[in-house]
Amino acid sequence: MVILQQGDYVWMDLRSGQEFDVPIGAVVKLCDSGQIQVVDDEGNEHWISPQNATHIKPMHPTSVTGMMEDMIQHLGDLNEAGILRNLLIRYRDHLIYTYTGSILVAVNPYQLLSIYSPEHIRQYTNKKIGEMPPHIFAIADNCYFNMKRNSRDQCCIISGESGAGKTESTKLILQFLAAISGQHSWIEQQVLEATPILEAFGNAKTIRNDNSSRFGKYIDIHFNKRGAIEGARIEQYLLEKSRVCRQAPDERNYHVFYCMLEGMSEEQKKKLGLGQATDYNYLAMGNCITCEGREDSQEYANIRSAMKVLMFTDTENWEISKLLAAILHLGNLQYKDRTFENLDACEVLFSTALATAASLLEVNPPDLMNCLTSRTLITRGETVSTPLSREQALDVRDAFVKGIYGRLFVWIVDKINAAIYKPPSQEVKNPRRSIGLLDIFGFENFAVNSFEQLCINFANEHLQQFFVRHVFKLEQEEYDLESIDWLHIEFTDNQDALDMIANKPMNIISLIDEESKFPKGTDTTMLHKLNSQHRLNSNYIPPKYNHETQFGINHFAGVVYYESQG
């Protein structure tokens, strides 16, 4: 039996069984009228009858104040509800950083906060975790200090949903490391200037985030014996190439296209046959040309300036512009159905878009038309050409465009690495140390989820398992080894989902790969195999009806339905 008084704080558990439903904090306003009146943290009033009093539990004093800087050490209600309330109260007080052991939790404030100045960098330099309030600079300083003291490489994993602020956190860590490494060199400037280039070609506006990273990156920052930055190397993963050809409503293509059209001179645009963003199918598909808060023309100037710092020549910049323009013109090609020897075929209508695209790619228009409307096979020295239907030709055109952009992105990353990477010294007395920053796209769940979302969410499942292992599994194993009597923490382990997706025999990835190699493999046969193999797995959700084309996966962050068609 719980005895309550006016002003007591309680947990109110009115969960309806919906996803992410947790108890909510509340304060007792009235409890002497047979019913209990409470007001929850969102300002809503509730009347609780004596029969439902079991839904109310007293709140631990540490959760009442909700200002615990380290939740592992000081939070009494160490559960999902307690953690969320602590983060909420701190967030309302503009305290966006909170520790949970060695992990820093950051809540995106969606506004500029004056907590990243040179003075803040000075305050967090050479400080142990806990000496100062939680901050991204404290994590960066801890990595740097451990690298120098222990002469061991460090790694910082930045994880979270799309729009959580991962890219900004990466930039802040880079800013801190550049400031404290002891010298403001040209190489430090080059490392920092790589960011606007990568964002231009790899980021886009989505419904959740105006500057969403559509690729993953791992930045390895190299330090010499004195602790000064002497170079870096960038690895890129899983660029979302499909965005070049199609975007969801209220989303944009990659920033660089809009920046180029707004920032180029009229003379340059004329040479490339370019007009306005609304003129191009690849840019107008999402009905979102502008992005609030972004000045595309100014961003273009920033990109060009950064490219000069990273040693891109004027010739290379112009060749990049030609490829980007060619992509836009290819997206405006018009196709017409026709029949060839009783086979469905098509032709590309001759237009300015075709002529300009061919000119920019430095090929003859007829050759380009032929490549986009037929399939050529060479077997035993014999060449066989088969016409493509209009639908097939559109897919080929889009695949061609995605290939161009994907290879261009890889080349740009390689060009940046050529400027910022310095081979390690062969002298044993001067060992190189590094701090790695992993900035990878967050968990995604859109109206339509494709294979790219599956890959992204699979990567996030691995990160979640990393955190589960280090926060829960290893800690509890250590307690068990030392025979320490303690209350085991219940947690959700996502290892079964990982096994189903990619680890166990006949996993989802292997089945998709296998079906894509069969000459007669289709989206329908692939879905049938997935259903047959995994329908009894609790982490797999098969279609309810035969005509449905989606299957679901119960990820750690929620259920996501993937479209098998396309």
From Swiss-Prot:
Chain residues that bind ATP: 160-167
GO BP, one annotated term: actin filament organization
Ion transport recorded as keyword: no
Chief location: cytoplasm
Subcellular location: Cytoplasm; Cytoplasm, Cell cortex; Cytoplasm, Cytoskeleton; Synapse
Gene3D superfamilies: 1.10.10.820, 1.20.58.530, Kinesin motor domain, Myosin VI head, motor domain, U50 subdomain
Entry GO terms, CC: actin cytoskeleton; cell cortex; cytoplasm; membrane; microvillus; myosin complex; stereocilium; stereocilium base
Domain Myosin motor: 67-566
MF-aspect GO terms: actin filament binding; ATP binding; microfilament motor activity
Highest taxon of the lineage: Eukaryota
UniProt KW keywords: Actin-binding, ATP-binding, Cytoplasm, Cytoskeleton, Hearing, Motor protein, Myosin, Nucleotide-binding, Synapse
InterPro entries (UniProt xref): Actin_motor_Myosin, Kinesin_motor_dom_sf, Myosin_head_motor_dom-like, MYSc_Myo7, P-loop_NTPase
SUPFAM superfamilies: P-loop containing nucleoside triphosphate hydrolases
Function: Myosins are actin-based motor molecules with ATPase activity. Unconventional myosins serve in intracellular movements. Their highly divergent tails bind to membranous compartments, which are then moved relative to actin filaments. In the retina, plays an important role in the renewal of the outer photoreceptor disks. Plays an important role in the distribution and migration of retinal pigment epithelial (RPE) melanosomes and phagosomes, and in the regulation of opsin transport in retinal photoreceptors.
PANTHER family for the chain: AGAP003327-PA (PTHR46049), MYOSIN VIIA (PTHR46049:SF10)
Subunit-structure text: Might homodimerize in a two headed molecule through the formation of a coiled-coil rod. Identified in a complex with USH1C and USH1G. Interacts with MYRIP. Interacts with RPE65. Interacts with CIB2. May interact with CALM. Interacts with WHRN. Interacts with PLEKHB1 (via PH domain). Interacts with PCDH15. Interacts with TWF2. Interacts with USH1G. Interacts with MYH9. Interacts (via MyTH4-FERM domains) with cytoplasmic regions of ADGRV1 and USH2A. Interacts with PDZD7 (via MyTH4-FERM domains). Interacts with CALML4.
Family: Belongs to the TRAFAC class myosin-kinesin ATPase superfamily. Myosin family.
Record's protein name: Unconventional myosin-VIIa
Source organism of the structure: Sus scrofa
Classification lineage: Eukaryota, Metazoa, Chordata, Craniata, Vertebrata
